[in-house]
């Protein structure tokens, strides 16, 4: 089960290595009053008094792995539970962001974020040779990578 309070350190990396570390918790708790199977999905950075994000995790079609993260401020993002990973991929203010939450065992949850500008850094391919049509490939920059290994409290 994913339910529980998960705690650890979030490490933030750039091209030159680790740039910052901050304490992090994720609270995933069933909402007692919910008949829809909703859960709290709170992200806490540096303590509840510093950066507390009281989101909710809402099932849409759990049999197909479709959920939504409701930020409770009109932002609602589709998320996908595929195998051991919950994935959410979105664009905000020109940055493309992929968040993943991976339950590796009953006591460990790995949280990762990859982000970078939505503008490609290169476009290659898009040509023909004697033997094949080469598809166009756009490569996007990665500016920040974040990772936390969280343990169940």
Predicted regions and their residues:
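A short hydrophobic beta-strand element
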Residues: 4-8, 37-39, 107-113
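Beta-sheet ligand-binding and adhesion/scaffold domains
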Residues: 64-153
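N-terminal helix-cap/turn-to-beta initiation motif at the start of protein domains
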Residues: 1-5, 32, 100-104
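Central antiparallel beta-sheet cores of small beta-barrel/beta-sandwich binding domains
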Residues: 16-99
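Short, solvent-exposed loop/hinge segments that bridge or flank secondary-structure elements
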Residues: 7-38, 136-153
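Short beta-strand segments enriched in hydrophobic/aromatic residues
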Residues: 10-12, 45, 115
């Amino acid at each position: 089960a994913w339910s529980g309070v998960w705690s650890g350190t979030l490490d933030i990396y750039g091209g030159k290595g680790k740039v910052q570390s901050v304490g992090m918790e994720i609270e995933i708790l069933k909402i007692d009053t919910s008949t829809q199977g909703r859960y709290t999905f709170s992200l806490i950075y540096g303590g509840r008094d510093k950066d507390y994000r009281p989101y909710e995790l809402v099932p849409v079609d759990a049999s197909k792995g479709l959920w939504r993260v409701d930020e409770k401020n009109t932002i609602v993002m589709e998320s996908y539970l595929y195998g051991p990973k919950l994935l959410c991929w979105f664009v905000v203010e020109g940055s493309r962001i992929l968040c993943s939450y991976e339950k590796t065992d009953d006591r460990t949850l790995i949280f990762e974020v990859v982000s970078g500008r939505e503008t490609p850094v290169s476009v290659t391919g898009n040509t023909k040779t004697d033997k094949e049509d080469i598809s166009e490939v756009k490569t996007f920059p990665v500016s920040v990578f974040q990772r936390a290994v969280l343990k169940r409290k």
